[in-house]
Amino acid sequence: MLYPQEFDVIVVGAGHAGTEAALAAARLGQRTLLLTQSLETLGQMSCNPSIGGIGKGHLVKEVDALGGAMALATDESGIQFRILNRSKGPAVRATRAQADRLLYKAAIRRRLENQPGLWLFQQAVDDLMLEGDRVVGAVTQVGVVFCARAVVLTAGTFLDGKIHVGLSHYAAGRAGEPSAIGLSARLKELKLPQGRLKTGTPPRIDGRSIDWSQCEEQPGDGMPGGVNAGQVPVFSFMAHAYGGARMHPQQLPCWITHTNQRTHAIIRSGFDRSPMFTGSIEGVGPRYCPSVEDKINRFADKDSHQVFLEPEGLGTHEVYPNGISTSLPFDIQYQLVRSMAGLENAHILRPGYAIEYDYFDPRALKSNFETRQIRGLFFAGQINGTTGYEEAAAQGLFAGVNAALQCRGDAPWLPGRDQAYLGVLVDDLITKGVTEPYRMFTSRAEFRLQLREDNADMRLTEVGRRMGLVDDARWEVFSRKRDAVLRETERLKATWVNPRNLPDIESGRVLGKPMAHEYSLFELLRRPDVDYAGLMSLDGGKYAAADVSRETLGMLSESVVEQVEIAAKYAGYIERQKGEVERAAHFETLRLPAGLDYAQVTALSIEARQVLSRHRPETLGQASRITGITPAAISLLLVHLKKGGFKGFMSANADAQA
């Protein structure tokens, strides 16, 4: 049957990538259809019940700054919040939250069902409709044909997914759900370059069977026994408009236990039946979230590993033991769980398993995540070789935006590595590809001092507003914050403190020593031991500003002060990094000719020519980041392009040098 209504964008898959893609495309005014195998699993957290972390929290904040759903859904469902790296610099601080799975799903579904211009439909997709080299729709398993101008594939682990428990294995997209075998076969027919990856999940435990007295309690921030008592963090920049931490449901602690030598002996006894070691699993697993058997094998000298016991939600006793992801046979899982302190009588509710699945080489994508071979077909999420909810959500928003922009006839949105972690993620994928599931870290961003969690809105919300992603409510909150930060920064720079008018004892109290000469408040705030609150208390509060008070700004006051303080204390570093950004931008403006025959660039080594021919970078900057391409090779390529006088290149080069 040909469905009578046509759409602009079809999104296939309703996990973290698909939901953000569909919401973004609809917010940009495109008629959007979200196809899913089950409406009951919209936004499902397939593995751990948490959002955020180092690098990952930065992506969540960026999705939020662009009007995405993940951060607000986490605030509405989060049962524990923590700021990681709190004692370190602002560039690497990150928010992490435990979420109630059911509340999170409900929050996502509510947003999907209430988004204008977005339709939901429950059916698996088995085929894509093509006209020449362009996708024009999707076909479901019962033959319903949906037509559209763009299709975004966010199939997660469902493409030819196979679950492994010991020597047993069966086809599945995740536990209890069928894999997308037909769609995977269709993509292989299109000769898109692909491979196999794997991920895994631990056995789930009934919390009533755990002896919590034998475990170490780990309270969240703001909880009794945690840091910042009474001040629970929030994820979304909009949370302040909805009551801040009052949005959160009841807060719960996590708990910690440990593996031991007996645990490790049990695990080793199952190596001969582990699909990892018998060769049953072809896919490569995530380096930074290894299975427990992989940890015991690789780190044989370690006698113990931490295991975090994380509650799955308020309405269930189910517990997620973070740290023992495994595909070992169930009898080994049973023994290894019961070998740990507090878990001696643990009842396993669900066995752990590994799942391997198809992914497609992201180097075959254009900069906007459109496939090079099929026009109008976009990929996002684990299909691109990434791991993690946050990486998926960010890619989904990016692909959904660019699919919608293409339908509108607008230029693609391509954030740079200096603008967003999303830009780093996209650039890493399309230039370097993946050999293992890709996970975001702050260390991947060379300009991370500019790409902090706290300023994601200052970097991206105006961009989102121009595209149409950001609604009036978010824009009003952002504008108040932005304007207050600008006003207060200028006031601090323009307000001077004269030592003749300040008693030495008062100067010593706030500044640590008497002032030698006149300083602006901004200069004083740059000192390591001076904070904003202390500075505003100087001389009886003489220099405090009502505009930045909690009475004036409400809950926004804290984030405004944070921005002002970071701008002052890191001014020198930020300016230096801006210079690095400007130097790096030179190569990013030099677009390589689409039809350039690298085989004719004889000054390059054969290897370099082969690598560039395979990758087809779009700019000289992208080319410089490809593995195996040296600075010398870039210089030789630049000389070739100059001598060849390629159309558009010389003018761009001249502009860049001017």
Swiss-Prot record:
SMART domains named in the record: GIDA_assoc_3
InterPro entries linked to this entry: FAD/NAD-bd_sf (IPR036188), GIDA_C_N (IPR049312), MnmG (IPR004416), MnmG-rel (IPR002218), MnmG-rel_CS (IPR020595), MnmG_C (IPR026904), MnmG_C_subdom (IPR047001), MnmG_C_subdom_sf (IPR044920)
Broad class of where this protein is predominantly found: cytoplasm
GO molecular function, one term: flavin adenine dinucleotide binding
Residues noted as binding FAD in the record, renumbered to the chain: G13, A14, G15, H16, A17, G18
Keywords for this protein: Cytoplasm, FAD, Flavoprotein, NAD, tRNA processing
Protein location: Cytoplasm
Family matches, as Pfam families: GIDA (PF01134), GIDA_C_1st (PF21680), SAM_GIDA_C (PF13932)
SS bond partners: none
Needed co-factor(s): FAD
GO BP annotations, alphabetical order: tRNA methylation; tRNA wobble uridine modification
Family stated for the protein in its record: Belongs to the MnmG family.
PANTHER family: GLUCOSE INHIBITED DIVISION PROTEIN A, PROTEIN MTO1 HOMOLOG, MITOCHONDRIAL
Subunit structure: Homodimer. Heterotetramer of two MnmE and two MnmG subunits.
Function of the protein: NAD-binding protein involved in the addition of a carboxymethylaminomethyl (cmnm) group at the wobble position (U34) of certain tRNAs, forming tRNA-cmnm(5)s(2)U34.
Name of this protein: tRNA uridine 5-carboxymethylaminomethyl modification enzyme MnmG
